[in-house]
Amino acid sequence: MLRILDITAPDINNGNGIRVTLWVAGCTHHCKGCHNQWTWKYDQGKIFNEHKDEIYSKLSDWLSRDYVEGLTFSGGDPLCQDIDGINSEMEIVEWVRKNFPTKNIWLFCGDYYNDLPENSIKKTLCNMCDVIVEGPYEEDKRDIAHCPFRGSTNQNILYINKK
């Protein structure tokens, strides 16, 4: 089940332009030096299926603004969710595509895109997004000065769908 920790906006740290960031609960990577350790636990936040109206209302309020470029999934890790959680994230992506077709969608994850099984639900979610920031944070490769939107040099920005 997907749990939402927070929705932050306006946000300029988690993708190009001014964005809305959806923070999901839960991560199994537990990267040493992680900036978002507060998001690791799965038993915190609002259960998406029980708070959909509230979550969609807040997202709509921000995504309807012309100056907001899109939505970012962060956390935690959007890919470190059970099947129900991934399905909920896919529902959110489909909702954004339907209601705000000009907005782009970024997703941060600790996995490498090419390591995901081709027909997996995780890869399907990634393919629904426009930009993936992939790879675990590696403290010994920290270089925030030269890695926009990333914390370490092993992380990559992949443009999956151009918007």
Language-model segments: residues:
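A generic structural signal for alpha->beta connector loops
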Residues: 1, 102, 128-129, 154
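Conserved Radical SAM active-site core
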Residues: 2-7, 18, 36-107, 113-120
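N-terminal pre-triad scaffold of radical SAM enzymes
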Residues: 3-30
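Flexible, glycine-rich phosphate/dinucleotide-binding loops
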Residues: 13, 114, 141
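Structural recognition of alpha->loop->beta junctions
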Residues: 56-60, 64, 118-141
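P-loop/Walker A phosphate-binding loop and immediately adjacent motor/lid segment at beta-alpha junctions
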Residues: 85-93, 97, 142-163
